[in-house]
Amino acid sequence: MGRVQTVVIVKNAQGLHARPASLLIKTIKAFDCEVLVEQSGCKANAKSIFGLLSLAAGYDTRLTFTAQGREARVAIEEIRRLFERNFAEVYPAKTGSLIQRGTSQEKNSI
């Protein structure tokens, strides 16, 4: 049960706000491990909405996630996947409003 770590960059124009933070927490809580996140020397419990939001991670912020426990490796893989997919959020240039990927709303906005 070693430590597993990944570094991600926040690519959401609105940063790591409440909706993606909630999805991140829900994802992490599914795994048997502890996860910490660090940004510029500040550390937080990645399973805590207050911890995540207190980092004030805006666009282009670098975050380091460290997991330890039985399912640490798979948790880190899922965290990386969420950030790579930008939490499945799309912000069309014309409206600037949030559209969930894979919905009819997304198809109509293109």
Predicted regions and their residues:
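Short, low-order "capping/linker" segments at domain edges
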Residues: 96-110
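Intrinsic-disorder/low-complexity, polar/charged segments enriched in Ser/Thr/Lys/Arg/Asp/Glu/Gln
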Residues: 3-7, 62-64
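Short, charged N-terminal helix-start/capping segments
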Residues: 1-3, 110
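Compact, glycine-rich, soluble single-domain proteins
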Residues: 9-58
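Alpha-helix boundary/capping detector
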Residues: 50-54, 70, 78, 105
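Glycine/charge-rich, flexible interdomain linkers and switch-proximal surface loops
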Residues: 44-47, 95-99
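N-terminal processing/targeting junctions
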Residues: 59-61, 104
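C-terminal structural segments of small proteins and small subunits
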Residues: 61-98
